């Protein structure tokens, strides 16, 4: 069985199509080719917000003004990967931001695979955006001890990966955490820390271990 990859990934977010509610002949887009790229160079884009935009009536047009599926436009212009973030419960509290939960990520993965695109899913371990300035612990876990939080990360990660498997749409890559240079799942997993980063390391290991338990073929 072909090895699948589990690692952190920087996607080259290349805008391949034109987004607008009305097509415009004046909205010219030019993307100059980059010479000497290796054949396995990933050309990807994060499209987590796409279902939300479509639900609000957004339409997408290719460079010739023809209305098309945005994923198809991207593929036509060289995109071969998409990234999908997963928030634990984006409908809780302030939430929103496209409600990019597990269910939407599964649906988008199926849609991408139908077009021959590969998929990376990105666990934020948050109900909202996780980045260097904020790594909010999901509300359901916010009163956890360190041991409880480690267990929650493991169990949640394993369940999501198994859900993708059962849906018949395993992602080609899985990213544990998002923009985690300052840690994740604050305050327990925040960096730098007084414990020598042990709590952060335990949380990371829990996520990685869960993926490999659910899918031993990942490296």
PLM segments and residue spans:
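N-terminal carbohydrate-binding accessory modules
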Residues: 27-79
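Bacterial N-terminal signal peptides
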Residues: 9-20
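Sec-dependent signal peptide cleavage junction
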Residues: 21-27
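Bacterial N-terminal signal peptides that target proteins for export
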Residues: 1-10
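Generic "edge-of-domain/loop-turn" microfeature
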Residues: 15, 23, 52, 89-91, ...
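Substrate-binding cleft and catalytic face of glycoside hydrolase catalytic domains
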Residues: 73-196, 203-218
């Amino acid at each position: 069985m072909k090895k699948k990859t589990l690692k952190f990934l920087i996607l080259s977010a290349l805008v391949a199509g034109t987004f607008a509610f009305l097509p415009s002949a004046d909205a010219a887009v030019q993307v100059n080719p980059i010479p000497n790229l290796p054949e396995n160079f990933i050309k990807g884009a994060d499209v987590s917000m796409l279902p939300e935009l479509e639900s609000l009536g957004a339409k997408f047009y290719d460079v010739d003004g023809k209305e098309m599926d945005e994923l198809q436009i991207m593929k036509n212009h060289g995109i071969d990967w998409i990234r999908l973030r997963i928030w634990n419960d984006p409908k809780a509290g302030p939430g929103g931001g496209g409600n990019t939960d597990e269910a939407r990520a599964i649906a988008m993965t199926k849609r991408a695979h139908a077009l021959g695109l590969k998929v990376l899913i990105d666990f934020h371990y948050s109900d909202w955006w996780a980045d260097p300035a904020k790594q909010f612990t999901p509300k359901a876990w916010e009163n956890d001890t360190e041991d409880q939080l480690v267990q929650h990360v493991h169990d949640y990660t394993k369940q999501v990966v198994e859900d993708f498997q059962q849906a018949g749409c395993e992602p080609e890559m899985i990213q544990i955490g998002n923009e985690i240079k300052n840690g994740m799942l604050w305050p327990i997993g925040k960096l730098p820390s007084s414990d020598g980063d042990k709590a952060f390391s335990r949380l990371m290991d829990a996520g990685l271990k869960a993926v490999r338990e659910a899918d031993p073929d990942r490296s």
